[in-house]
Structure formats: C-alpha cells, structure tokens
Amino acid sequence: MTAARNDDSQELTIAVLPGDGIGPEVMDAAIAVLQRLQQCLPDLKLQLRPCAAGAAEYLRSGSALPTATLQACRDADAVLLAAMGLPHVRQPDGREVTPQIDLREHFQLYQGIRPVYLYHALDSPLKQAQPGDIDLLILRENTEGLFHSRGRGIAPESETVDDILRVTRVGSERLFHAAFQLARQRRHHEIGRASCRERV
C-alpha cells in the first residue's frame, strides 16, 4: 500500500489488533520494537491505531470483527495483529471465533510467507548446521483449501462430519506466480533436486 509522504519523511498508519490470550502481551513487545525503530529513524512517523477484534470483542459486542475495525484496516497502510480467539468462546454453531481468517478473505491475503533462517548454530538441532546453512521460504495458501469451507461443513449423521477442501485454478496460479517471483528475488543458487507430488 502507498503511504502519505512529506518531503523526506514518511508517515505510515498501522491498524493494531491486539487480539486475545497472549495476544496483547505479544503486541506490547511488537509496539516497543516499532517505537525503538522510530527513535532510530526520525523521518519515519508511525501512527498506531488500536482496533477491537477477537473473542473478547465478540463477547462484548457480538462481532469478532466490527465494521469500524474493518474500515480502519482498509484505511491503514498496514495491519498488525496478534493471536485471536479463545477456546471457550464459540459461535452459536460451535465454531471458534476467527476474525484473522475473515481479514485474510476480505483483503485476499492469500500468501502465508514463512521464512526459515539459521542465525546461530546453537539454535538448530542439526549438528553441522552453521549460520546461513538453513535459508528457505515456505509459502502457504491462506484463503482456499479447508479455510474455504468454514461454516459449510455437513453433518449427515451425529458421528460423522463432512468438510470440503476447495482448490481453484485462480488461487493456485496466483500462489505459484508469487512463489516464482520470490525465488527470482532470492536466487542464491540453483535447485539441485526437486520433488513433485501429484495434487489430487
């Protein structure tokens, strides 16, 4: 997303969703890092806007992702969210409260990008691994598959539940395109061996 810029400075608005459980504690640490970053980069101006979302908000207002929060996320340059949902807080049909997945679907945040990098040899159980030896990127599709079937499952009998896993050409192609774009950017070395699995 683009941000408003004034001369050499830049101002970014971040919608902050602390969430539930350990979420607020994790968010406090993340905000401390952002505040320190602003001290180191005086031209960077961050406007942090707290927003209500999650299981606690569901209990309070009946909505895990209020319209005002969704609009704040839409208007922001970035969204920073922590853990959401509590095991004992359920919707009337028994499903957990998952506003983070609602956000993914609303904004089509289909890429789950998960880097894996070894910074220190002691961080790895692999005996010969040295810093930099482990450097890979995992991409996960975040909106299709079993995510698509939330609330659409079928219970034909009391002991059985059927679910639907959805994979579309559009969803697959956009993820593959993103994966190859990231591979071009990284391009540390050529792949020596690749394995393929049939996708049913």
Q: PLM ranges: what are they?
A:
Residues 58-165:
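N-terminal glycine-rich phosphate/adenylate-binding segment common to multiple enzyme folds
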Residues 1-7:
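A short, basic/flexible loop-to-alpha-helix module at the beginning of a structural domain
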Residues 19-21, 53, 84, 118, ...:
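Short, ordered loop/turn segments at secondary-structure junctions
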Residues 9-14:
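Extreme N-terminal starter segment of soluble prokaryotic enzymes
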Residues 43-67:
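N-terminal beta-loop-helix "entrance" segment that forms/cooperates
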Residues 52-54, 142-143, 195-199:
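Glycine-rich beta-alpha junction loops
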Residues 49, 81, 189-193:
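Short beta-strand segments at enzyme active-site cores
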Residues 15-32, 37-41, 157-199:
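Glycine-rich phosphate/diphosphate-binding loop of Rossmann-like nucleotide-binding domains
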